[in-house]
């Protein structure tokens, strides 16, 4: 550890890969199977983590990059990790998840949108940034991998969420 938990903040995608492995050990299931069951329970039928990075994903938006040279090319997916990324979804499924977050009494959903208990850090929760944006309480996070970018910004008091997806 770099510091005592709850005293400092250092973002690391690797932590989510470790968490996925812990879930596998505790449940005895592959992380992709466990998460698929979670999404299916919410009726998010078009959401899953990539299992085979060369596999066909129906209606997938292809990633593009100009590699800094001004000419756009489709970007190959060259890695596959679970926990920190490579989650595919649709706007329909994101809306289902958002409604669940806004209306849920699920303790995990509620805690994920608040600062970590007994922590000196008040601008980060369980995987989510907690800040004021345009004078309003905002809960947000982005995701970036070569050729893709996503951003979700939630204004809970207004029951407003903005999704930005690009490739």
Task: Walk through the language-model features, giving the residues of each.
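Short, surface-exposed loop or secondary-structure junction motifs
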Residues: 1-146, 150-151
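Short, well-ordered beta-strand elements
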Residues: 151-167
